[in-house]
């Protein structure tokens, strides 16, 4: 039944969480101020806490003073990192696993994998890929497995799938790139990111021109 739903497109896409949407819309204004972004961030305590934690991490601090308020955190991290952190939080909000069981393990494994891919994508773009923005590569890494999150959450209604992990993995492999593309397009992300989400499993991908974010 789940395979039929996916194949005929009869599935409801999740809404883009409100705080991430407001951050993204504000950042579309090239003249947006740190104060305006800070006001949006402060409306979501979890996002505020996460930004403070990242700003005070060993990678970001580098001998600087401890960041104690959201405005300082935004100034240290930059707008793109704020956007990516809001998207990461949006994924956590949109795809909350149950407290226990195989679905939770699958979701948590996918979440850890997405973070690793995001970090590696950032490093590769910064060091190797001329023309690919590191922050865009990081965002794409965070989103590349979003279809997998969605299918896993739908699979909760079919508990027998978790008794046959090979069948579930087959569904995930076949459908998560296309479902992921549908979600990121519905959420209004750029075409380049949608293509990367759709084609990230195509290891022999070939195209004219320089490397793009899908190649990363």
Question: Language-model segments: what does each one mean?
Answer:
Residues 1-145, 149-157, 163-216:
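Conserved alpha-helical "signature site"
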